[in-house]
Every structure is written in structure tokens, then in C-alpha cells.
Amino acid sequence: TRGQPGNAVVVFMHDRPRRYLRERFRYAPDVPKPCLIPRMFTERELMAAFRQEQHQKLRREAGKLDQIALLSRCVRELAEPDTELCMQLAKTDDAGFFPWGVRLADLLEECFTQGLTPEDMLYTEGEVAPFGAALLGSLGKIFRRYRDALIESDLTTPGFDAFVVASALEEGTAGDDLPPLPDFLAGRAILLAGFGMLTGTENTLFRYLWRHGAQVFLHVDPALAENGQGHWACTEQSNWIADWKADTVLACPSPGKKPK
């Protein structure tokens, strides 16, 4: 940042490192005061900021009960007469649907977070309860209807924000051209710190930022930077580096301790 920390953007996995970094700037004797500190995001906040850049209309975050109510409506709309799903729904009410709605909401949120569009899972009878088998048999259709219903209702979830952002970036980077950074990141040094394993949507977003010059800081075995052969516990990070075909540089001296 050439002595201008306010020109940096730092992205953390959660809020705790941000609090520590703020305290570091506040009390460090070697930091001149007053100064502008870096703009800091958690991964979730960054996804929401990208979503807001892509879609200016504000959307309310759906809580768990909102998600379940919306899913109940979607499932009932999809339950055609004489299908297993329709017959199972006929045997239950909203209270009976609720525990299945919780599981279904969690499953679809995980699909959103990983950037996956599931298909119908057939022939699960005997493996799960009959109602669960009926839901899984229509999983792909439920996912697509739920996705559309969130948009129609001006609702979102953290996973859906990530799904929309990653989908737009994948579409924009399909060719050779790299979409420009949004205004709130343009011209800033971008640092990604504290991540170990990436979800599918994080991988899409962070790789886009990395191609724009973002630096990634990993707290791992120094051997990954020295010879690429790190401790087995760093397998995920090693695969990450290999997948991106990224160069590595040791950011600070090795402590000299060998991992067990």
C-alpha cells in the first residue's frame, strides 16, 4: 500500500481477525496517527457487497422460518396429483412438514454455498423415510422453484447471495475477458487472509479477485512455499495452490519447528 493502509481491502473468514487488526492499528507504536485503516470484510459481507453491486434492489434476508414457509409453498406447488410427493403431503400438515423443511432448507443452502444445482435423486426408497424419499425424488425441481421464489419474493440468504455472485462471475469469465472490479475494490490492494478450505462459491470469487492481483495469505506449513511438499494436514491448501497454478512466496521466516 506504499505506507497508505487505507488503500487496502482485507477479507477475513469471520469477524475476530478484523477486531484484532483494528486493535493492532490502534495501539501499534510504529503506526503513525491519525491514519486510515484498511477496509475490512468478512467473506459473507463481501458476497453481499458483490450481490448489491450486481443487483441494486435491496432484498430482505430470509430467516429459517421464512425459508421453511417458502419451501412448503414451493413443494405443494410442485406436488402433481397421483405422484408420491402429493400422496406424502396429503398425509401431513404444516407442523408435520416443519422438520423436513428444516432439513431441506439446510440442504439447499449448502447447495447454494457450494455453487451446485442438484438434480432429482431417484430410487432412495428404503434408504430414507418415505417423505424424505419423495422430497429427494423432486430435489432438482424443488431447488429451481425455491430459487425462483426467493427472487420473486425479494428475499435472499447468505448462500443464495453467494450462488448469484458466483454464477454471474462464472458467466462473465467464460471467455478470455476478465470483468472489471466493482467500484468499491477498484484501485485498492486486496488481501485474502485466514482461509483454509474454500466453498465452491468462495473459490469462484477469490480466484476472480486473485486474477485481478489480490494476494492470498495462508497460515500453513512453510514447506508449501519452499518445495511444494507440505505436511499432510495442508493437503487442501496444497490442492488449492495447484488448482490455481499459483506461485508461492514465504511471507515470514519459518519458526524452524517441524510439524508432527
What do these predicted ranges mean?
Residues T1-K260:
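Nucleic acid-machinery interaction/catalytic patches
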